[in-house]
Amino acid sequence: MGVTVKQLQPGDGKTYPKKGDAVTIHYVGTLENGQKFDSSRDRGEPFKTTIGVGDVIRGWDEGVPKLSLGERSVLTISGDYGYGERGFPGLIPPNATLVFDVELLGIN
């Protein structure tokens, strides 16, 4: 499956992150059953990372560049684009589909 994007709130429609760009994102990550496993919103601090260079799961590297600045969308990521067969012990089962509510706050 890879990654699907469902827009919740449009962004500017013209500014998109490219491979190697640093991005600032708020997100809430859940399993398909709705069980939350991580949230930058709960921590009160946006997450910063570089897109397209393997610093994050493949689903983010491929899904985030489809969002324009200010956009909020749901990324649904199949297990092979997430944590794969290993999962993330104690949080994410093997081959789990992940659902992220993501808001692209900044592109640096």
Swiss-Prot record:
Q: Which Pfam families match?
A: FKBP_C
- List the Gene3D superfamilies: 3.10.50.40
Q: What is this protein called?
A: FK506-binding protein 1
The gene it comes from is FPR1
In alphabetical order, the GO MF annotations are: peptidyl-prolyl cis-trans isomerase activity
User: What is the purpose of this protein?
Assistant: PPIases accelerate the folding of proteins. It catalyzes the cis-trans isomerization of proline imidic peptide bonds in oligopeptides.
What is the enzyme's main class? Answer: isomerase
Q: Which domain of life is it from?
A: Eukaryota
